[in-house]
């Protein structure tokens, strides 16, 4: 599972953490990286892979200006950005949003048309399960029904959508299983859904007001998978990892070239495997508030300095730190 900065929304900040390795916990409270801070070129996974000859493409079947993506994506290293205008207007939709299956059909079409042997980094943000979940769709069959009065229609609707996502994901994995070109797929959730408190209390078995910090953090965790159609160094020690480490973990497990910043993040993860705006978890599994002064404070402060250089110090961004030329 990966730990995110918030629950119920804010997809772009999850994108930012994965793509840059930076943490939203270092931004002002309720800050948004895409709309407030990415005003110039910022190093990212896209820019690193671009240095190594990859074409870089972002794809999100929604309006291009959502979360300022049409401005941000070029600044963080993407050559091109496909939005909802690239989709078949008559394509499958649930609740007005393009289905995951329709989204993945577009990805398959892109891969079928790309130049053979030319490496491609494609960053896709799906839209099917976008909130809210109050209104039913007569064209969508809700197959999940939890037999408990606290399991509301919205919860059942959301879980039915996730079930549909599972089916679509299986299909695209099967597609890449049959491709000769080495391919890596990283899939992770952007945030937990915004559902009624009564449903979450059903899951916890207690009032949300009585949750410990450790229990609260469960509302900020989502599943992830790193898969490849060839043998990779699969790890079993990734039960708890925050999104800012996820791209570095992917580079490590697949033996792709890393920057010194990636190496710093992987070393930091050994001490602080997960952190977000609520706090962090140390190597022994103990939860801490960000305001605590302890043996991890110096490391977290160093991390904040490096993030400042990446995001804020546009005239002095360290090419040695964020470039792959000096990495492994």
Segments predicted by a language model, with ranges:
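Solvent-exposed soluble domains appended to multi-pass membrane proteins
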Residues: 1-328
């Amino acid at each position: 599972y990966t730990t995110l900065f918030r629950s119920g929304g804010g997809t772009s900040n999850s994108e930012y953490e994965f793509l840059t390795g930076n943490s939203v916990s270092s931004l002002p409270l309720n800050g948004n990286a895409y709309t407030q801070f990415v005003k110039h070129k910022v190093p990212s996974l896209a820019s690193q892979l671009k240095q190594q000859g990859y074409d870089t493409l972002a794809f999100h079947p929604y309006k291009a200006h959502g979360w300022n993506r049409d401005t941000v994506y070029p600044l963080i290293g993407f050559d091109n950005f496909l939005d909802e205008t690239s989709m078949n207007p008559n394509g499958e939709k649930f609740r007005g949003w393009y289905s995951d299956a329709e989204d993945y059909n577009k990805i398959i079409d892109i891969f079928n048309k790309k130049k053979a042997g030319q490496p491609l980094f494609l960053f896709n943000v799906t839209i099917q399960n976008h909130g809210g979940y109050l209104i039913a769709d007569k064209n969508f069959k809700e197959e999940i029904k939890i037999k408990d009065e606290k399991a509301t229609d919205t919860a059942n609707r959301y879980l039915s959508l996730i079930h549909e996502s599972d089916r679509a994901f299986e299909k695209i994995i099967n597609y890449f299983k049959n491709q000769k070109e080495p391919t890596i797929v990283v899939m992770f959730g952007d945030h937990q859904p915004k559902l009624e408190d009564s449903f979450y209390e059903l899951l916890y078995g207690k009032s949300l007001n009585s949750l410990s910090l450790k229990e609260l953090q469960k509302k900020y965790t989502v599943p992830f998978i790193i898969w490849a159609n060839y043998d990779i160094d699969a790890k079993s020690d990734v039960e708890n990892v925050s999104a800012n480490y996820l791209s570095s973990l992917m580079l490590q497990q697949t033996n792709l070239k890393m920057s010194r910043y990636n190496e710093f993040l992987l070393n930091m993860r050994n001490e602080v495997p997960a952190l977000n705006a609520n706090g962090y978890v140390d190597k022994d599994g103990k939860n801490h508030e960000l305001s605590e002064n302890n043996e991890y404070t110096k490391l977290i402060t160093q991390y904040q300095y490096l993030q400042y250089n990446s995001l804020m110090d546009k005239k002095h961004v360290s090419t040695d730190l964020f470039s792959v030329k000096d990495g492994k």
